[in-house]
Amino acid sequence: MKKIGFIGAYDKTDMLLNIAKILTTMKNKVLIIDSTINQKAKYVVPAINPTVSYITSFEDIDIAIGFKNVEEIKKYVGTTGDLTYDILLIDSDTEERIEEFELNKADKNYFVTSFDMYSLKKGIELLRNLKNQLNLTKILYAKEMLKE
């Protein structure tokens, strides 16, 4: 099972749904974990009986909302071994969740931001406050791109 972290204050929900859709089309079983403060996936992805923490399916993608770590997800699905997913996409915007989901041990981590001051400053603050060092690839978003 591959674990991929998406870190930063920028909203990553739509991007993760698009990545997950590509991965499921390639026959991968994918779980998106929304561990962000706002939990936007709760409002974007339909759920029949939403509770404080739950897993719902949307277009062959499973989405976990409200969990503090992978162990809570294992408990929810009733397993003590590894989860049955090929890929975990973990969306995080706090130091606590980065540590709880052990993203320092992830196969890959991406720092996702745009050029707005909030996303940049909050993202830098987040990275500065981490206890464990992370190897990151940055992704920048902009509404308008220059043709160069």
What label would you give each PLM region?
Residues K2-L17, K21, L31-D86, D93-E96:
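P-loop/Walker-type NTP enzyme "switch/lid" segment
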Residues A20, T24, L103:
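Gly/Ala-rich phosphate-binding loop of Rossmann-like dinucleotide-binding domains
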Residues T24, G78-D82, L127, K131:
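Surface-exposed amphipathic alpha-helices with a cationic face
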Residues T24, Y43, P50-S53, N129, ...:
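Solvent-exposed, non-transmembrane amphipathic alpha-helical segments
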Residues I87, S92-E148:
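Conserved catalytic-core segment of NTP-binding enzymes
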